C-alpha cells in the first residue's frame, strides 16, 4: 500500500513538472523518490511525520528562493537558442527552437510531433 502511494506521488510530481516546465522530469522524479525513501526511513526510526513535513516545506521554500535569485531572463533569440541547445543537447535543435519561437512570438504555441517519415 505505501509503495503504491509513493509511486503515485512520484508519477504526479513528474507529470506536474512536465506540465509546468516541460523539462526536468527525471530530476524531479529522482528528488521525489529520495524524499519518499528518506522520509519513510526517518518516520520508521521514530521521527514525527508532521515535523518532517514542515522541514521539507521549509527546505523547498529555501531552494525555490535560491533558484529564483539565480534565474536569468531569456529574451533574445540567441539566448533562447543557447538555452534550448543546452536542454536538447544539440545546437542545431536549439537554433530550430529559437527560430520557431521567433516566428510565433511570446503568445504562440509550438507543437513538436514525431515523424514516421524516414530520411526527411
Swiss-Prot record:
GO biological process terms, alphabetically, are: protein refolding
Question: What is the protein's major site of localization?
Answer: cytoplasm
Question: What highest taxon heads this organism's lineage?
Answer: Bacteria
An annotated Gene Ontology molecular function: ATP binding
InterPro entries membership: Cpn60/GroEL (IPR001844), Cpn60/GroEL/TCP-1 (IPR002423), GROEL-like_equatorial_sf (IPR027413), TCP-1-like_intermed_sf (IPR027410)
Q: Gene Ontology terms, cellular component aspect?
A: cytoplasm
Record's keyword terms, sorted: ATP-binding, Chaperone, Cytoplasm, Isomerase, Nucleotide-binding, Stress response
Q: What is its EC number?
A: 5.6.1.7
Residue positions binding ATP = 23-27
Function noted in UniProt: Together with its co-chaperonin GroES, plays an essential role in assisting protein folding. The GroEL-GroES system forms a nano-cage that allows encapsulation of the non-native substrate proteins and provides a physical environment optimized to promote and accelerate protein folding.
Q: How does it assemble?
A: Forms a cylinder of 14 subunits composed of two heptameric rings stacked back-to-back. Interacts with the co-chaperonin GroES.
Q: Which family does it belong to?
A: Belongs to the chaperonin (HSP60) family.
Q: What is this protein called?
A: Chaperonin GroEL
Gene transcribed to yield this protein: groEL
Amino acid at each position: 500500500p505505501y509503495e503504491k502511494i509513493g509511486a503515485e506521488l512520484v508519477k504526479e510530481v513528474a507529470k506536474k513538472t512536465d506540465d509546468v516546465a516541460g523539462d526536468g522530469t527525471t530530476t524531479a522524479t529522482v528528488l521525489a523518490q529520495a524524499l519518499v525513501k528518506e522520509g519513510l526511513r526517518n518516520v520508521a526510526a521514530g521521527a514525527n511525520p508532521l515535523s518532517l513535513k514542515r522541514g521539507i516545506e521549509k527546505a523547498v521554500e529555501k531552494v525555490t528562493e535560491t533558484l529564483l535569485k539565480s534565474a536569468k531572463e531569456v529574451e533574445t533569440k540567441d539566448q533562447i537558442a543557447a538555452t534550448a541547445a543546452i536542454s536538447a543537447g544539440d545546437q542545431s535543435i536549439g537554433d530550430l527552437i529559437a527560430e520557431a519561437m521567433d516566428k510565433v512570438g511570446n503568445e504562440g504555441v509550438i507543437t513538436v510531433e514525431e515523424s514516421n517519415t524516414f530520411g526527411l
